[in-house]
Curated annotation (Swiss-Prot):
Biased amino acid composition, Low complexity: 1-13
Protein's UniProt name: Ras-related protein Rab-37
Compartments (UniProt record): Cytoplasmic vesicle; Cell projection, Cilium
One cellular component term from this protein's GO annotations in UniProt: secretory granule
Encoding gene (name): Rab37
Highest taxon listed in the record's lineage: Eukaryota
Motif position, Switch 1: 52-67
Amino acid sequence: MTGTPGAATAGDGEAPERSPPFSPNYDLTGKVMLLGDSGVGKTCFLIQFKDGAFLSGTFIATVGIDSRNKVVTVDGARVKLQIWDTAGQERFRSVTHAYYRDAQALLLLYDITNQSSFDNIRAWLTEIHEYAQRDVVIMLLGNKADVSSERVIRSEDGETLAREYGVPFMETSAKTGMNVELAFLAIAKELKYRAGRQPDEPSFQIRDYVESQKKRSSCCSFV
């Protein structure tokens, strides 16, 4: 076969030009699961974080597993969060169990206007300890804080339960966006810290970080 005049061929002893290696637009990946009873607002919570929008209208329960990705920047590192939205119904629980082992962080939601969703948190935590990684990051979230007139779960009750299990806690609103981004950024900071702590880097405690940010938001009325 005759080569194109002037073009280098394999016989010329020159290596062909190669495209530069693909460089992803993130430094590390973190897999996050949203857990909790059906109707606590997991899908709306995810859409608020991903798109900055509130999914209003007729409620349609998640069937099985849905996922979305978003890259956030924390402390100069780009963290790609792979977020799995799970079905809360009992009949899909076996599907959810299959994803526990790969998750590095779990956001466990209840609805502050629904007593049973809060009562079932202990059962969810039992499942987590049975199926998830031993060092998985867990955060407890009391969602729908914007509907304060219908509240049946006090914030203090959420705080008490979180302390019992040694996990960070905050109340959130998928509708207004209150503390939604903070929850994911706290997770991203923790995963970034675990991925490669530098010798001169101060210790990072996710519970302390969440508490400091909650106080800061309260003082500045910025949520």
